[in-house]
Amino acid sequence: MSKFYEWISPDSDVLELEKTGLKPPPMYKVVLNNDDYTPMEFVVEVLDKFFSMDLEKATQLMLTVHYEGKAVCGVFTAEVAETKVAQVNIYSRDNEHPLLCTMEQA
């Protein structure tokens, strides 16, 4: 087996694996903001449709939005967060509701 490695001389340049040091992507919170006009049922519908929440979790989060003014719907990479914010805002406008979804750095 030593014959297999004979072609590598001890003083030759040998490539070593370099650690790339990949960092995880920055994460963003998708936030639903309260308003005085959007029906609670519509907020629950949005949470179900765009964040795949079951009825109980969506209702709890809707109540948090209602009583605390805003709530985090989820934490995502920038591209996913931007997409969800746009989807919710477009869907809200299409249904003539002023519901506002925003994103904040986590």
Curated annotation (Swiss-Prot):
| UniProt record, GO biological process | protein catabolic process; proteolysis
User: Which top-rank group of organisms is this from?
Assistant: Bacteria
List, alphabetically, the SUPFAM superfamilies matched. ClpS-like
Q: Which Pfam families match?
A: ClpS
Q: What PANTHER family has UniProt attached to this entry?
A: ATP-DEPENDENT CLP PROTEASE ADAPTER PROTEIN CLPS, ATP-DEPENDENT CLP PROTEASE ADAPTER PROTEIN CLPS1, CHLOROPLASTIC
Question: What the protein does?
Answer: Involved in the modulation of the specificity of the ClpAP-mediated ATP-dependent protein degradation.
Subunit (UniProt): Binds to the N-terminal domain of the chaperone ClpA.
Q: Which HAMAP family match?
A: ClpS
**Family label:** Belongs to the ClpS family.
Designated name of the protein: ATP-dependent Clp protease adapter protein ClpS
Gene symbol? Answer: clpS
